[in-house]
């Protein structure tokens, strides 16, 4: 059952639509390299499309009716958007759920130090990275510094063409004999992922100044951001690849960028959501944090945020609220866990079983199950739900494929799917196939981005 190449369906009009969507996506992924930046931009786009802040409706006691659009912001790191459907909430929602955190390197709480004539920031990597991929690259610093007076300072260094970039040094090949004898996982140690931020001492330093290079960095941070060294204690600073996403390939058919996992599915979910008006079932787009580290914490999918905000929505759309209505709503809901899958790579065919692999250019892909080895830890979607989705996609003319995450016993992975499925709703993973997954620069096919957005929209509009 080989799936067709979706590019072959393109005429000039469709090609223009593909390029228009992907141009917008390239801007999004270039500008939004942290979960906070993704939420901020999502709110901007939602409000431009007529969405209201749900908290304002709650405080005012404003009832909601079919067609109303609202969003809920959770701590600046998670966002849920809703379009109220014509069916009662009790009948369930159609949910798109993606994550907006990506593998990266975080700055520690007490990070700045001087070693010989270099100033460096100590770090702790976040998520599953191949550490050796992050050395000798131009890197940028994104994040916030929260000060004791309550102000929050936004920091972005390394993105503007006039900005300096930062980096983590690697060992020269001439002295790398011992390093190269190690396995890849051990060649670069986590404690050696130290970010170089300067090498010039402060001018006219006093004779007793022991760390003049560090002092210059602190004086620059004070001048530009009005922050002190102590403010690092309440900072969230993320180290990410510097520079924008770009067209990839001589034919410009692909996109190389940081954070396709999972911002390509986050953006296509958001873009599909913003197109939906007056659905039958209430539509929901849920963009969450912390998936790469287990979905824990107040902004991860394990948080009660989602259930709480659905309860608030029910209270504003129903004459009366009960916990039973909430439970029925969740049970009757359907969800697409909008997450990427591993694309077949002809350079590494040995890790895939071709018949059940996702291919770039053949549309978005459904993963009936993820997990590892014997499907450990997976959400295994029901056959009836897959049949329902096949019909939805075929009726809408969406190019899709099905896949597993590599050969049996080769490895595996997981998503937020099982967390929502634990609420007894129908859930399946589906999204864009990705090359170089979890590398600093990942690759996706433009036609897959387009078909994924179409598939998500078809699901939200489905009447059953």
Where are these regions (language model features)?
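N-terminal hydrophobic/helix-forming segments and targeting peptides
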Residues: 1-464
């Amino acid at each position: 059952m080989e799936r067709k190449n979706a590019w072959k369906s393109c005429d000039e009009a469709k090609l223009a639509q593909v390029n228009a969507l992907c141009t917008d996506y390239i801007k999004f992924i270039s500008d939004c390299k942290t979960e906070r930046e993704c939420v901020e931009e999502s709110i901007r786009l939602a409000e431009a499309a007529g969405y209201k802040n749900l908290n304002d409706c709650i405080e005012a006691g404003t009832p909601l009716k079919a067609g109303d659009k609202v969003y809920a912001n959770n701590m600046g790191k998670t966002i849920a958007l809703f379009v109220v459907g014509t069916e009662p909430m009790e009948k369930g929602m159609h949910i798109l759920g993606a994550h907006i955190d990506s593998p990266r390197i975080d700055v520690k709480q007490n990070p700045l130090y001087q070693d010989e004539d270099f100033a460096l920031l100590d770090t702790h990597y976040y998520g599953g990275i191949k550490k050796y991929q992050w050395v000798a690259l131009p890197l940028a610093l994104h994040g916030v510094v929260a000060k004791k007076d309550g102000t929050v300072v936004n920091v972005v260094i390394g993105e503007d063409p006039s900005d300096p970039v930062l980096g983590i040094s690697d060992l020269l090949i001439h002295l790398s004999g011992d390093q190269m004898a190690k396995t890849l996982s051990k060649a670069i140690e986590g404690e050696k992922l130290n970010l170089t931020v300067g090498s010039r001492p402060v001018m006219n330093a006093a004779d007793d100044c022991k760390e003049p290079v560090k002092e210059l960095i602190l004086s620059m941070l004070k001048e530009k951001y009005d922050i002190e060294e102590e403010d690092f204690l309440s900072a969230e600073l993320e180290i990410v690849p510097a520079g924008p996403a770009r067209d990839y390939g001589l034919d410009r058919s692909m996109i190389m960028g940081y954070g396709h996992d999972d911002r390509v599915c986050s953006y296509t979910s958001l873009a599909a959501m913003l197109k939906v008006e007056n659905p039958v079932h209430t539509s929901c787009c849920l963009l969450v944090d912390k998936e790469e580290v287990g979905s824990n914490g107040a902004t991860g999918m394990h948080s009660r945020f989602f259930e709480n905000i659905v309860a608030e929505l029910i209270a504003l759309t129903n004459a009366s609220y009960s916990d039973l209505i909430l439970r029925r709503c969740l049970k009757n809901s359907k969800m697409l866990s909008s997450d990427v899958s591993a694309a077949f790579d002809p350079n590494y065919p040995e890790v895939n079983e071709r018949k059940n692999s996702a291919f770039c250019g053949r549309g978005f892909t459904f993963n009936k199950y993820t997990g590892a080895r014997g499907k450990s830890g997976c959400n295994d979607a029901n056959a009836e739900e897959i049949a329902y989705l096949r019909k939805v996609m075929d009726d809408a003319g969406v190019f899709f494929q099905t896949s597993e995450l590599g050969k049996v016993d080769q490895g595996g992975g997981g998503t937020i799917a099982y967390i929502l499925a634990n609420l007894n709703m129908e859930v399946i993973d589906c999204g864009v196939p990705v090359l170089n997954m979890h590398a600093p620069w990942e690759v996706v096919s433009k036609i897959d981005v387009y078909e994924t957005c179409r598939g998500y929209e078809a699901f939200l509009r489905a009447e059953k």
